[in-house]
Amino acid sequence: MKISVRNLEPTKVKLTVTVEPEELNPYLDAARKEIAKQVNVPGFRKGHVPGKIIDQRIGFAAVAGEAVNDAVPELYSKALDEKKIRPMAQPEFDVQDVPQSANDETKLKFTATVERRPDIELPEIDGLEIAISKPEVKDEDVDKRLETLRQRFGTLVGVDRPAAKGDFANIDLTAEIDGETVDSQEGVSYELGSNTMLDGLDEALDGLSAGEETTFEGTLEAGEHEGQKATVKVKVNSVKAEELPELNDEFASEASEFDTLDELKADIRKAAAQDAEGRQATEARDAFIAKLQEGLEIPVPKGVKANMVEEQLKGMTPDPEKATKEQKAQAEETVEKDLRDQMVLDALAEKLDVQVSQSDVFNFLASIAQQYGMDPNNFIQAIIKNGQLGSAVQEVGRSKGLLAGMRAVKFTADGEVVDLSAFLGEAAEDEESESVEAASAAAAVADELSAKDDAKDAE
């Protein structure tokens, strides 16, 4: 098999693959056997028709067509491995030459255009030192958490005064467009200042007492008339204020497992400290990834970026085509960062010879299934059938590479070494003997999992 590579862009290549007849013959033979199982030829049992008869009766074109369909993806995969090209999208195939008969010496020739991960020269990480912030818990952090807990035990009490920010008003709403009522709601409980309903509602309610009403102009945010201006009439039925419990030992015993307020505060401070350490670990991760990219110009694949931006916009606006310039710019910035981070972590996994085992993939997918309350086995089989196992393997490889890389780095805060072992864990002592690169391990794992699934079905 002869392979030539033409660089179209820094992240896009065109492979031209020429296949010798002896390399194509096994695919032709397999195609003949498969066709023989499907056709009836007088004088022969089904599935036992000689290849030459298949060529004569069915036609070599049908045989070659099926053979090419099977051969091209496999030979493309081999070409990628041989040329060490890491694809980031599905290829565009163009079959140019195909033998027209069993005796035709024409070589199968096809091209594959695909976006690829660029070559990334990562720095040596052994002995690397990265400075991060020191975790800090302030008194106001504890007070803020305590106040949040206090609000959970608050009660609403009716008040005979105008509504103010923080109060809860029971209201009736009527929206009109050109004098016609288009929407109405009764008995809605609304917190003034929350700005969770119509624009202008907070201002309209401020200062109103129970039994009073007013009108204001607002834009409807849902329903058939979404986005249209409407005249909204609001009536206040009642006003309630939140009454909070006193901060004392009695509150502590009611709101927690502790008997005193001091004990409760100490526990809150401990939880705040743990959260601060978690934020420090996140900062360390981000700083490490940024350090790997320091001084590097990493191009991103245009097509992959465009698809990801489109998906990002779907989560930002109901109609991506009507997205604002600011939304598009934000989506592009987010996608470019995510892509560069992913490509760098993939390169790191290869550099560190990361090993991805079947149990790694199982544990990763099972944890996702658990988060969504799904049966792990059903979820894993769905991933396999949808062709998403490769992405899962890549994600596992990135995660393992990231942890291994961070373990090799010294993180410091105010000149002192930071111990992140609680978040990074320890390196696995017993790894599988065969090194499997994260980007190419999916096929082997998928075959093994699928084989088990087939065996179960056969029982």
Swiss-Prot record:
Residues 166-245 form the PPIase FKBP-type domain. One of its GO terms (molecular function) is ribosome binding. One of its GO terms (cellular component) is cytoplasm. It catalyses: [protein]-peptidylproline (omega=180) = [protein]-peptidylproline (omega=0). It is an enzyme of class 5 (isomerase). Its EC number is 5.2.1.8. One of its GO terms (biological process) is protein unfolding. Pfam families: FKBP_C, Trigger_C, Trigger_N. Its main location: cytoplasm. Keywords: Cell cycle, Cell division, Chaperone, Cytoplasm, Isomerase, Rotamase. The keyword Cytoplasm applies. PROSITE patterns: FKBP_PPIASE. It is found in: Cytoplasm. The keyword Transmembrane helix does not apply. Belongs to the FKBP-type PPIase family. Tig subfamily. Involved in protein export. Acts as a chaperone by maintaining the newly synthesized protein in an open conformation. Functions as a peptidyl-prolyl cis-trans isomerase. Consists of 3 domains; the N-terminus binds the ribosome, the middle domain has PPIase activity, while the C-terminus has intrinsic chaperone activity on its own. This is Trigger factor.
